[in-house]
UniProtKB/Swiss-Prot annotation:
Protein name per Swiss-Prot or TrEMBL: Diaminopimelate epimerase
GO cellular component: cytosol
Matches recorded under HAMAP family: DAP_epimerase
Compartment(s) of residence: Cytoplasm
Family the entry assigns: Belongs to the diaminopimelate epimerase family.
Gene3D superfamilies to which the protein is assigned, alphabetical: Diaminopimelate Epimerase, Chain A, domain 1 (3.10.310.10)
Self-association and partners: Homodimer.
One Pfam family linked to the record: DAP_epimerase
Swiss-Prot/TrEMBL keywords: Amino-acid biosynthesis, Cytoplasm, Isomerase, Lysine biosynthesis
Chain's role: Catalyzes the stereoinversion of LL-2,6-diaminopimelate (L,L-DAP) to meso-diaminopimelate (meso-DAP), a precursor of L-lysine and an essential component of the bacterial peptidoglycan.
Enzyme class: isomerase
Length: 276
């Protein structure tokens, strides 16, 4: 079958976006892996699928698949690309839309300057909500990795994150520790591993080793999780500029039981059609 797609990115975190509203899209894990393959397919970190909403009062359904073919709960950079895509494709003329994801409703908004702000929902910290194997809900957990004990904050932004503070993201052992943290036995569903350098109380640098994709140029939910973790630890104040390898995001959080707001760009690189 022939499938139309758009190639997009948010700060270098790149996506193949599929319109499941105007074309039938039902792909096997093998086909998803083929699409994501940078040598034989289109190439991307994740595949985003736009579908009709399954409930009233919601505009669209948003599904996310990693490069390994597995479906995941949430992707912040993808959410920005999602709202840009549905506007550019004429699927809606609303500046703010309500979108259902695997883990709840999000409300991305297209700003006048072309950036997109996404209400990423309320962060969760209880170990059972991550999920993370621990008895207590504490701000810092000790995680044994590669003969080291790491001070780690665990946060769910609809998907699981483990965040640690490092002296420098340039020398952080992302390639070594990232996959070990991702598959650590205390995270039953695996985890995204964040490495955060504090610049000042309103700025950080961040690298993220993403679950199922490896290190990416940027991770929206990872940026949210890092800022939330830093604020809870008393290291940061909202709003925070997050500098990733792909560019900058602005993250704002008002505290417990309040949603995290993420603002940043979304870019269409090209459109095309592929035979599957």
């Amino acid at each position: 079958m022939k499938l139309k797609f758009s190639k997009m990115h948010g700060l270098g975190n790149d996506f193949v976006v599929l319109d499941g509203v105007r074309q039938s899209v039902s792909l096997s894990p093998e086909q998803l892996c083929y699409l994501a393959d940078r040598h034989f397919g289109v190439g991307c970190d994740q595949i985003l699928l736009v579908e009709k909403a399954s409930q009233p009062g919601i505009d669209f359904r948003y599904r996310i698949f990693n490069a390994d073919g597995g479906e995941v709960e949430q992707c912040g950079n993808g959410a920005r690309c999602f709202v840009r895509f549905v506007h550019d494709e004429g699927l809606t003329d609303k500046r703010e839309i309500r979108v259902e994801t695997m883990r709840g409703i999000i409300s991305p908004r297209l700003e006048g300057d072309g950036n997109v702000t996404v209400d990423m929902g309320i962060p969760r910290f209880l170990p059972a909500e991550i999920p993370f194997l621990a008895e207590d809900d504490v701000i810092i957990h000790l995680l044994d990795v590669a003969d080291e004990t790491l001070e780690t904050s665990v946060v769910s932004m609809g998907n699981p994150h483990a965040v640690q503070v490092v002296d420098s993201v340039d020398t952080a052992p992302v390639g070594e520790h990232g996959p070990l943290i991702e598959k650590h036995p205390r995270f039953p569903l695996r985890v995204n591993a964040g490495f955060m350098q504090i610049v000042d109380r309103h700025a950080i640098k961040l690298r993220v080793y993403e679950r199922g994709s490896g290190e990416t140029m940027a991770c929206g939910t990872g940026a949210c999780a890092a800022v939330v973790a830093g604020i809870r630890r008393g290291l940061l104040d909202s709003p925070v500029r997050v500098t990733t390898r792909g560019g900058d995001l602005t993250i704002a959080w008002g505290g417990d039981e309040r949603p995290v707001l993420m603002t940043g760009p979304a870019v269409t690189v090209f459109t095309g059609e592929i035979e599957l």
